[in-house]
A protein has these predicted regions:
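Bilobed "Venus flytrap"/periplasmic-binding protein-like clamshell domains
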Residues: 5-30, 88-154, 161, 262-265
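Conserved beta-strand segments of alpha/beta enzyme cores
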Residues: 12, 36-38, 74, 131-132, ...
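Short, glycine-/small- and polar/acidic-enriched structural segments
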Residues: 16-104, 108-112
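General small-molecule cofactor/ligand-binding pocket signal
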Residues: 38-42, 132-136, 285
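Hydrophobic residues within well-ordered alpha-helices
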Residues: 50-52, 148-150, 271
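Pocket-lining segment of extracytoplasmic ligand-binding domains
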Residues: 137-231
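Secondary-structure end/capping motifs
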Residues: 203-270
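Long, low-complexity C-terminal extensions of enzymes
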Residues: 261, 269-287
Length: 287
């Protein structure tokens, strides 16, 4: 939903309203009163497309989106959606052990290209299997989409709120937290999303970028201090217990320190070697 109004728009900002962004999003709604900043809420893949098409000036996008079009963007320092170890909301749910998925059909969520690339790296590089992939979005109650109901789906990639719902069900015997696997293999956190700014906006309005970055960092700090009340607001959406929501959000990380930048570089190096993104994805460029 866009908060459209009569004020001249000085910045078009894309935000994800999943549970994992609640500490930022809920505090932004409460604290930031800038009608000249137009907020668009959407899943990561929609924000990816909008930023690419110049329908946004900056926003939370999949890490993969920056790497795919490095000539278009720069990153805001100190901001990400990351996890060190289990993330709790990016899973491969499978009826078989991952080693048994070669030639089997795996449904990939079309909500995040970063998670799609990560699960392919994990299956193909770490488990040495080549499944058959198809794309689709699970229903809110974790059921297969219409396009997949006639297929023999053996595993599904689920992210965000969908994954939080599905991890509590018994539909799949194997529940592989992709961030946890990544950390075991690389020793690094995983950076799922970044704040990317279009190059022309960097040139046009650096002052607005600085103000927006300040508010983002402020909201994240306020949100982390107020997790209990935020969980009271957002836990019923899944639904999940407030304590489970609190534990989940405590595991989310929103900074982009040196270790996370290293993790981003390792991920981008995989993508470059796999031919998914251009070599210009490295080194990472910042505002």
């Amino acid at each position: 939903m866009d908060n459209l109004d009569q004020n001249p728009v000085t910045a078009r900002i894309g935000m994800v309203n999943f549970i994992n962004t609640a500490p930022l999003y809920e505090k932004w709604q409460q604290l930031v009163k800038r009608p000249d900043w137009r907020i668009t809420e959407a899943p990561p893949t929609t924000l990816n497309r909008m930023l690419y098409n110049n329908e946004l000036d900056l926003g939370f996008v999949s890490s993969h989106e920056y790497a795919a079009h490095p000539h278009l963007y720069r990153l805001l320092r100190g901001l990400s959606i990351s996890a060190t170890g289990p993330v709790g909301s990016v899973f491969l749910f499978s009826k078989k052990d991952p080693e048994m998925l070669s030639g089997k059909t795996v449904l990939l969520s079309s909500l995040s290209q970063t998670s799609v690339s990560l699960v392919k790296i994990i299956l193909e590089e770490y488990y040495q299997v080549i499944p058959n992939y198809m794309s689709g979005i699970l229903t809110l109650d974790g059921k297969l989409p219409q396009c997949a109901q006639e297929k023999d789906i053996q595993a599904v990639l689920a992210i965000g709120d969908n994954a939080l719902r599905l991890r509590e069900s018994d539909l799949y015997t194997v529940k592989l937290d992709l961030s946890e696997v990544w950390q075991k293999k690389t020793g690094l956190p995983f950076v799922f999303a970044v704040w990317a700014v279009r190059e022309e906006f960097c040139q046009k309005d650096p002052d607005s970028i600085s103000q927006i970055q300040h508010q983002l960092l402020r909201c994240i700090e306020e949100g982390k201090r107020d997790l209990q009340s935020i969980c009271q607001i957002v836990a019923p959406r899944i639904p999940m217990k407030e304590k489970d929501c609190f534990d989940y959000l405590c595991g989310m990380e929103y900074d982009l320190d040196a270790n996370k930048l290293k993790a981003l570089e390792v991920f981008f190096d995989y993508l470059i070697k796999r031919g998914e993104v251009p070599a210009e994805a490295l080194p990472v460029k910042f505002v």
